[in-house]
Amino acid sequence: QNNTVVATIMSNMGLFKAMKREGIEVCVTTVGDKYVNEAMVANGYVFGGEQSGHIIFSKHATTGDGILTALMLMEVILEKKQSLGTLCKGMQMYPQLLKNVRVEDKAAVIGNARVQVEKDRISTALGEDGRILLRESGTEPVIRVMVEAQSDELCAKYVDKMVQVIREEGLAVE
């Protein structure tokens, strides 16, 4: 319905690219099934979820339900008469690496000029084939550094560089 899927900012780039290729809009929210559900209700969307596996079918429930998700997936497999592997071939998952950096002041990290310059440099280097996210945890005194790229090696290289800059700026708690 509404040809839109609701997903969080942490969803894999492969999802965004696959949806675009299929002509499906993606409404992006902050992390948390609460925010996914809020966007679904506010806009009349019927399907959304987050990378952690919380998949919401608003016609049936307001929270993620693993059994419901499995049943809905089985319905698609039977309807399309294709294996799950065949159905998934159209989506390339990008390698992704996430590191948590313990900090005293999350806002200071996000607002730090050198951190932002390095983030922009990495983003430019990755281009259309990757991305970097710096996100304040909502539950812990950490900054989450996430990189998606064409290879695990590139993910590690850029995550390590970003963490190094945060440490060099004296923002990390060792």
Language-model segment annotations:
Residues 1-174:
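Phosphate-binding and adjacent anionic-ligand microenvironments
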